[in-house]
């Protein structure tokens, strides 16, 4: 068994769906409320450009899985993103038993956007795979 800290390292604008539930998921987050975002996630602005992850309740534009709450990172044209959205508590995944799945979308189809999901045994981003 590995103790994994789930992390999304952003290189562009994305929307990710958040909330712990008792429906068989080891960890499930749909960002239904701002409290979920604050309690379950840590935001790190590693390049200190003040452009980083934030919670948005956007009823006019549903998120990737159809809800309205989302974690959003806005594209910064002049500075490559180096920002992290990490689970506050480690999530333990058992090899061959658990899998990671998530929804995300970009805000435009004009520019290619990318996202990286990292995992590791500590909160030190440089040690994550």
Question: What are the language-model segments listed below?
Answer:
Residues 78-99:
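Short beta-strands within extracellular/lumenal beta-sheet-rich domains
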Residues 92-96, 105-113, 123-125:
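Extended, low-complexity, turn-rich repeat/linker tracts enriched in Gly/Pro/Ser/Thr and Asp/Glu
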